[in-house]
From Swiss-Prot:
SUPFAM superfamilies: Metalloproteases ('zincins'), catalytic domain. It comes from the Bacteria. GO terms for cellular component: cytoplasm. HAMAP family: Endoribonucl_YbeY. Gene3D superfamilies: Metalloproteases ('zincins'), catalytic domain (3.40.390.30). GO terms for molecular function: metalloendopeptidase activity; RNA endonuclease activity; zinc ion binding. Keywords: Cytoplasm, Endonuclease, Hydrolase, Metal-binding, Nuclease, Ribosome biogenesis, rRNA processing, Zinc. Belongs to the endoribonuclease YbeY family. GO terms for biological process: rRNA processing. This is Endoribonuclease YbeY. Zn(2+) binds at residues 107, 111, 117. Pfam families: YbeY. It is found in: Cytoplasm.
């Protein structure tokens, strides 16, 4: 559950080569700039855990790249990111795993803020594109699906 003080990132089964401090700094930047200071927590874990969470909470029995869980409390909510999916997508799109995790984190935070690209007629796609440009991130999730 989101802590009231600040956003946190928990790493499970992450390789030693993963630049954890950069990911943690990016989470704090998202909290400040995108979420208007509202904290959120991020779990970076494996495909098996994302599949279990997706099955338990969304009734979809497959691993996905990012899940968002709004809190309804003082914090924004929680994100779960699949390290395996992030690694594969980073390779596929030609950028670093840290960049891919940042893209997934931004996408998840926009969902925590109440945006839903499946029903909002492009509003979340526009927001994601604007924030990616401001934050210096490569092509995002919604653009990949739309192209």
């Amino acid at each position: 559950m989101s802590s009231p003080e600040g956003s946190s990132v928990t790493f499970r089964r992450a390789p030693a080569t993963l630049r954890r401090p950069a990911i943690e700094r990016f989470a704090r930047r998202l909290q400040k700039e995108v979420a208007d200071g509202a904290p959120f927590d991020t779990l970076i874990t494996g495909d098996a855990e994302l599949r279990r969470l997706n099955r338990d909470f969304r009734k979809k029995d497959y691993a996905t790249d990012v899940l968002s869980f709004p809190s309804g409390g003082p914090g924004l909510g929680d994100l779960a990111i699949s390290l395996g999916r992030a690694r594969a997508q980073a390779r596929e799109f030609g950028h670093t795993i840290e960049q891919e995790i940042s893209i997934l984190m931004l996408h998840g935070v926009l969902h925590l803020l109440g945006h839903d690209h499946e029903v909002d007629r492009g509003r979340m796609a526009s927001l994601e594109k604007r924030w990616r440009a401001k934050l210096g991130l490569p092509t995002g999730l919604i653009e990949r699906v739309q192209s």
